[in-house]
Amino acid sequence: MKQGIITKTCAVAAALAMGVSLAACGGGSSADSDKGHVYFMNNKSEVVDQYKQLAEMYTEKTGVQVDVQTGASGTYDATMSSELAKSNAPTMFNISGFDQFAKYQKYCEPLQDTEAYKLLTDDGKAYSYTIDGDSFTLPYAAEWYGIIYNKKIINDYASKDYAVIKSADDIKDYKTLKAVAESINEHKDDLGVDGAFATPGLDASDTYRFSAHMGRIPLYYEYKDMNTTFSKTIKGTYLDNYKDLFDLELETSPTDPSLVSSKTYDDVTSEFALGQVAFYPNGVWAYTQIKGNEVADDDLGMLPYYMGIKGEEESGPAGVYDASWAVNKNASDKDKQATLDFIKWMVTDDEAKKILSQDMGFSVPFTTFDGDEFQPDNPLTKIARSYAADGKIEVRSFTVPDQQWQDDVAAALIEYAQGTGDWSKVKSAYVDGWATEWNNNEESLGSVPQAQKFDQQG
């Protein structure tokens, strides 16, 4: 993590004492205290330099002081709690996940009537944490996940006499995906690959792909059936479909199922990046590890998570909007307005928009980011976004309980893959664990997500 330039010695000392890094201090003679003050508590250390640049640009342009403080890895919550208790508390801060929202909800200003909120896309509004009609957060980074594939391998396969498709465009459902994967695996020596799917790695570094991501696909369709966006209890209606895809990955990957728990995120990403497999379920963020290896940008594609669920053919990849901005309701009216003006500037000024989208790499869910020049230079992001342009419905990533639920699902999957446990343990971890962890969260956090009608999202 790169440290920003600090202009005040006392600020450095305070930062070191708290284990955080100050990314930027607006100030100097250009700042005008009569115009209010913006103090942003950031939790993304990888973009600290870009936030520093935005802060300096805005202060120079408006005379409003913008301070940015960045919590070091693992210390954000502790630093937030300390800073929010002070008289000069942050005027805006990051929220990542429902657990953080529940913890800091009492500090959050309702934003649904602000200009910035009104500039959110419909998907952005749907992911804003909302209670009783009040929307408290502004999602600022959209990402997508699905089944990434290598077009070169698929096209090579499609040219063979034994191919079951004419081109990658024929893969529009799970039945076809399964037939292609099994056929590629059968003819892998002729195709020069090690398998069809990348190893479903169940090392701790890789389990999120199967709990937090793939696990949300059956949840989406179950919630759709229930016409709700949240329930403390679920049935696992589509877990058999999840099992079908997981089994397909196990059966057509380069790794013996008994060994998948030893495969790390880096291991399985390398399988795809080096052109050893055709399919790799993951998100757009994987591009940073894929690029510069054996798979050209033009050879990257992305399918939705096909599992054989009725209606999935009309859906695109799943979207996730975990990173949001919130405004401190306890700030002075002057500072709140200065903060809202700063946020609006970030999402409307062309130079600021390029920093957010291209330099930070965010696909920002505001209507002002409608051109390619305001999207990240990431072919997977462009592909994922193209599904919506073609009329496909984005699968929404509904909130899962906590890390414990994810860990328990992963542990059951490991036993299943190794043959030491059966599928009923996975279902129990998914279904029974869901109720257990939401009850625990309600007791510890004091709230759970507020349910809305599924067909009235956004």
Would you name each region that the model predicts?
Residues 4, 11-14, 19-100, 116-119, ...:
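Conserved N-terminal structural module of periplasmic/extracytoplasmic solute-binding proteins
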Residues 133, 293-361:
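Extracytoplasmic/periplasmic substrate-recognition and gating elements
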Residues 181-182, 227-262:
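Glycine-centered hinge/linker elements that transmit conformational signals in sensory
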Residues 70-79, 172-176, 259-274:
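Short helix-initiation/N-cap motifs at beta->coil->alpha
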Residues 132-140, 145, 175-231, 277:
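Extracytoplasmic/periplasmic solute-binding protein
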Residues 303-305, 357-415, 443-458:
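Long, aromatic- and glycine/proline-rich binding clefts that accommodate carbohydrate-like moieties
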Residues 112-123, 127, 166-170, 201-204, ...:
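Short, solvent-exposed loop/beta-turn-alpha elements that line the ligand-binding surface or hinge
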Residues 96-155, 209, 301-305, 375-376:
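Hinge/lid segment of periplasmic solute-binding proteins
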